[in-house]
């Protein structure tokens, strides 16, 4: 593994941890030359899964798009990057468990919303506004009302 600071090839692993899903290994590394420390992640890569978009197009599944959407929804909240990464891992695991080679973007959005609802209500409403394509303020109020009723 190359050091991101000096480009040296020689690094050592200081710590390794498997996440709760058992699908990701987090490694803390140190460069033997410059002593810089950095984190790497190893994830299981599953076969090609395609996402069916609303307009019918098919795109190769890309976990970074899920993370990007979650990060936008969680902006200026107390949700940590670690919590966001865990949610992405959970969504990916749920997709893998189906064994399907295709999944609709709507199904992915539903999985993300379920996870965000447990993590942060503000992020949930933000994500819902994009996922459900809100056009009116009443749509926001309806989602907030649903959240309040669930408590």
Swiss-Prot record:
Zn finger limits (unnamed): 3-34
Domain of life: Bacteria
Pfam families: ATP-cone, Zn_ribbon_NrdR
Keyword line: ATP-binding, DNA-binding, Metal-binding, Nucleotide-binding, Repressor, Transcription, Transcription regulation, Zinc, Zinc-finger
Listed InterPro entries: ATP-cone_dom (IPR005144), NrdR-like_N (IPR055173), RNR_NrdR-like (IPR003796)
The keyword Acetylation is annotated on this UniProt entry: no
GO molecular function: ATP binding; DNA binding; zinc ion binding
Keyword Cytoplasm in annotation: no
Binding note for cofactor: Binds 1 zinc ion.
Cofactor(s) annotated in UniProt: Zn(2+)
Residues of the signal peptide: none
Gene Ontology terms describing biological process: negative regulation of DNA-templated transcription
Residue ranges of every copy of the ATP-cone domain listed in the record: 49-139
Functional description taken from the UniProt entry: Negatively regulates transcription of bacterial ribonucleotide reductase nrd genes and operons by binding to NrdR-boxes.
UniProt xrefs under NCBIfam families: transcriptional regulator NrdR
Family per record: Belongs to the NrdR family.
Protein name: Transcriptional repressor NrdR
Organism: Thermosipho africanus (strain TCF52B)
